[in-house]
Amino acid sequence: MQCIETNNLQQLLEQVKPYTKKGKLATYIPELGNANPNDLGIAIFHKETEYIHAGNSQTLFTLQSISKVITLALALLDRGEEYVFSKVGMEPTGDPFNSIIKLETTSSSKPLNPMINAGALAITSMLAGNDNEEKMERILQFVRDITDNPTISYSSKVATSELETAYLNRSLCYYMKQNGIIDNDIEELMDLYTRQCAIEVNCIDLARIGLIFAMDGYDPYKKKQIIPKHITKICKTFMVTCGMYNESGEFAIRVGIPAKSGVAGGIFGCVKGEMGIGIFGPALDANGNSIAGFKILELLSAQEGWSMF
């Protein structure tokens, strides 16, 4: 597969930049409302030629729902498939990512998948550790290993902002606790979950995460397996079916690669055996995905023949 050049990335960014005007910030999390809606950046991390980047590619932003892929991988390492999927399902949903509807209407009362908020909260509740500090350090160290960036941390301001306004997520937790899906202290779980979502990265970090998943968990630069292959396979399957909220089907048709988005404007994707892509564009569409980020991935996929279908 031919390597993309930096000037090509810059041209594509300029081409899709007008789309940022059509999106909106995720103001329901107050700190995210302070982002610049015109920001747009991209990085591509290739298995052989390291990375190229353009635009606001070194601006820090929080993972938000992208962290769900990280914690799913950790939970599978900690607990194994049988336990994890006894508590969380494997099916996509047409409901909003923060909806409680399916919890109430499915006979098992378990979340449909790990990429919706209820499922992600259940996954976080499974992580090993004596307390939240130990669990959070494990999550951070996992992200540092994948990104090869030892400075990765989280934004306490964003975490606090989310914790103070997470009324719906608390209700999801209480409902799941009532039905035996989780048994954690709710406030402790919410504290850990909001900190996990507030982990800060830039596009280059995100592209490197994408590369590791593209290589089935293998780091071609460190020459070692970071995540077991079977776990990356599970994670990437969920990224295809559920990774882009209620646009996952359209994204599969228009772009055709495993990807996960977050409401801070991040998207990471992976082209199997080749490269990872990291994008930041905080102006979101109606489904909570970066509106310009979606478009640039659509153009790149068409140009480079990325689709897996």
UniProtKB/Swiss-Prot annotation:
SUPFAM superfamilies: beta-lactamase/transpeptidase-like. The keyword Hydrolase applies. Its EC number is 3.5.1.2. One of its GO terms (molecular function) is glutaminase activity. Pfam families: Glutaminase. It is an enzyme of class 3 (hydrolase). It catalyses: L-glutamine + H2O = L-glutamate + NH4(+). Keywords: Hydrolase. Substrate binds at S65, N117, E162, N169, Y193, Y245, V263. GO terms for biological process: glutamate biosynthetic process; glutamine catabolic process. Homotetramer. Belongs to the glutaminase family. This is Glutaminase. It comes from Bacillus mycoides (strain KBAB4) (Bacillus weihenstephanensis). The gene is glsA.
